[in-house]
Amino acid sequence: MSIGVVHEQTITFEAGIRLESGRILAPITLVYELYGTMNADCSNVIMVEHAWTGDAHLAGKRREDDPKPGWWDAIVGPGRLLDTDRYCVLCSNVIGSCYGSTGPASINPRTGKRYNLSFPVITVRDMVRAQELLLDHLGIRRLLCVMGGSMGGMQALEWATQYPERVASVVALATTPRPSPQAISLNAVARWAIYNDPTWKKGEYKHNPKDGLALARGIGHITFLSDESMWQKFERRFSAKDGLFDFFGQFEVERYLNYNGYNFVDRFDANCFLYLAKALDLYDVAWGYESMTDAFSRITAPIQFFAFSSDWLYPPYQTEEMVTCLQGLGKEVEYHLIQSAYGHDAFLLEHETFTPMVRSLLERVAP
């Protein structure tokens, strides 16, 4: 059952936070959405973390005639995995993004102009540090669960290691303890696409550098898919409107990348894309610790990992490295390798593959 129309909420923290870089980012505005009702002691809250270009609009619609629900609508609502008759679900837009939370596209109150490249470099840990302010504001002492895929999974790991006393359980899907050189190199090429768009102007543009950003997004889309899913979706079909020997004729897969790339330009800011890509590349769960073992020794909550067989952006072996480390520490950990043709995006597209296991975990830890 759908949860209907949901309205985003906004809170500003004037004091801000000290970032990993040592700089102070203040004030900080966070946009968030809530689904369901908190119980008396706020012990039924599940925090869902979004991925790279996601937002706080996890589920429901923004208005009655909204043609598209939130990005993980299928798992949120009465009777669904995150049952809003039982749980209160929270999703917050990360700092560095362009969907209402403070980021490069925000106005710097000291100058009255957009931050652009004067915005400080942020990390995934900084994102979570800002979210802690939100939990304090809402009166949430401890999350029943923190859950996310991809960059959302990184945030879940940060909650587990940095604030173990505030997390009762963790679900991390299609994520990594640190991006590989291959993942970093793909982001590098995406960055070059934006840097080399003459309309980018070193971040001081008036209008989004559409060609560079569309190309960058196209590169990203390739990493979200898999060889098998591309065969299933496109085969080697040629676009019907193009002649076979038209020099600019396109295969269906080319048309798909072009369409999604340029659609993305209308909804995401190029500088925010670059800053979040940097945060992804910098991510290392062992940052500030002697080792992953040292970092994971802090975890007290049961943790579930899900990897997807055709995910070549964050392949299963990267999840398995974390599982092995946690098992060696005697931590309560589950690992599920899901056979899927959908690549990295499988966690968004095949929720039924992990629903039973996550539901079981929530039943165990629920008050």
From Swiss-Prot:
Domain of life of the source: Bacteria
Keyword Cytoplasm belongs to the record: yes
Residues annotated to bind substrate: 217, 345
Biological or metabolic pathway of the protein: Amino-acid biosynthesis; L-methionine biosynthesis via de novo pathway; O-acetyl-L-homoserine from L-homoserine: step 1/1
One Gene Ontology term, aspect cellular component: cytoplasm
Residues annotated as the enzyme's active site: 150, 311, 344
Any Pfam family the entry gives: Abhydrolase_1
Gene3D superfamilies assigned: 1.10.1740.110, alpha/beta hydrolase (3.40.50.1820)
InterPro entries, per database record: AB_hydrolase_1, AB_hydrolase_fold, HAT_MetX-like
Location in or out of the cell: Cytoplasm
Alphabetized UniProt keyword annotations: Acyltransferase, Amino-acid biosynthesis, Cytoplasm, Methionine biosynthesis, Transferase
Enzyme class: transferase
Residues of the signal peptide: none
A GO molecular function held by the record: homoserine O-acetyltransferase activity
SUPFAM superfamilies: alpha/beta-Hydrolases
EC number(s) stated in the UniProt entry for this protein: 2.3.1.31
Task performed by this protein: Transfers an acetyl group from acetyl-CoA to L-homoserine, forming acetyl-L-homoserine. In vitro, can also use propionyl-CoA or butiryl-CoA as acyl donor.
Family from the record: Belongs to the AB hydrolase superfamily. MetX family.
Protein name: Homoserine O-acetyltransferase
